[in-house]
Structures are given as C-alpha cells and as structure tokens.
C-alpha cells in the first residue's frame, strides 16, 4: 500500500492510504482511528484529522479544540448527577465538559433547601409553611371522613325521622370530634396530634 500525499487543504495529490483520527461532530470527542484510502482530489473524511490524540487520562475526555487545530483534555463528568443551585432539581451529565453553571454535586436534603453559595441551607419558614398547609388539608380530610360516617343519620334528620338513642349518641360523638379537629392547633405542624374518630 502506498501512502497518500496531501496538500495544505488535506486533499490527496497522490492516491494512497492515510491514518485519520475521528471525532464526534457535536462534542468533538475522539472516537476512533481508521485507515482511509484517498483517491487523487479526495480529502480526509469529515470530523477527522491527521494528528494523533494524547493518551487517556482518568476523569477527562480527549476532544478536538474549538478551532479544530489540536486535541485537548476536557473534564469528563458523564454519569454524575448535579443539582441546580436555583431549583434543587437533579440532572445527569451526559456530555464531556465542566459542570454546568449554577449546579453542584451536593444533593439538597429537603425540597426546602436553598443554596447559599457553598452549601444547602433549609428554609425553615418555607418548610413550616408547607407543613401547616399539609396539616390544614389533613384537617379537612378528617372532617370530610367524619361527615361521611354520619351521612345516613343526617339523611334521617333531613327526612324528619326520629333517631334512635344509639344514633343520637353517635351523632353527638362525631360532632364533638369535628369540633375537636376544628380546634386543633396546626401551627405546630408537622407535630400535630389529631383526636381519634369515635368508633361507629
């Protein structure tokens, strides 16, 4: 096999084989080495060059420089998870390069954590406010369940029917329970102690 002779534009002036180093068209990351036969007037394949990349270094990808004139080592964090310092959302890194801006490798400990520039700090006011909102929703759920448990008794009352002693006792117990649930202090959330629904 004859070796190809190329001009300054990397076009073959004499047909033959040439070793090229291929890279990804988007990330410019080194992919492989191949031997190509070039006929006269044919250039090297797209996304390839003639200069060999350096040896592999742990934690780095070998990529073509932005001007395509040389190889460079680019940090390779692929497979790592980073967290947005704005929202706390996680994202897996899928391309070579530095960590994206406004991210950290430190995971937030709660949905209420805010980044202070160095670490996550829990926004206790937001956390407490969310706990109070959840307690208020729990209050309404308990009241709804209690009301559902006496719906037949309410229907009898609306129809003007007389209640048995057991039904009257049950109705009063559930109404007392609803009063107790309504009076429960949710400002201590998430440590709210709810009253027990009376047995049917």
Swiss-Prot record:
Similarity comment text for this entry: Belongs to the tfa family.
Pfam families: Caudo_TAP
Species lineage: Bacteria, Pseudomonadati, Pseudomonadota, Gammaproteobacteria, Enterobacterales
Source taxon at top rank: Bacteria
Protein name: Prophage tail fiber assembly protein homolog TfaE
């Amino acid at each position: 096999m004859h070796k190809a002779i190329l001009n300054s534009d990397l076009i073959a002036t004499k047909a033959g084989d040439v070793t090229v180093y291929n890279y990804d068209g988007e990330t410019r990351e080194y992919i492989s080495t191949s031997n190509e036969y070039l006929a006269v007037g044919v250039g090297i394949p797209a996304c390839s060059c003639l200069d060999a990349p350096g040896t592999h270094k742990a934690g780095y990808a070998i990529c073509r420089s932005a001007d395509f004139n040389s190889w460079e080592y680019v940090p390779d964090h692929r497979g790592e998870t980073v967290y947005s310092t704005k929202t706390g959302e996680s994202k897996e890194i899928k391309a070579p390069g530095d960590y994206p801006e406004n991210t950290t490798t430190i995971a937030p400990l709660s949905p209420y954590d805010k980044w202070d520039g160095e670490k996550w700090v829990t926004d206790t006011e937001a956390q407490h406010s969310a706990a109070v909102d959840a307690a208020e929703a729990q209050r309404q759920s308990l009241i709804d369940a209690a009301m559902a448990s006496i719906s037949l008794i309410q229907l009898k009352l609306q129809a003007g029917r007389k209640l048995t002693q057991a039904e009257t006792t049950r109705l009063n117990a559930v109404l007392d329970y609803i009063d107790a649930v309504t009076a429960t202090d949710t400002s201590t959330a998430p440590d709210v102690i709810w009253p027990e629904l009376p047995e049917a």
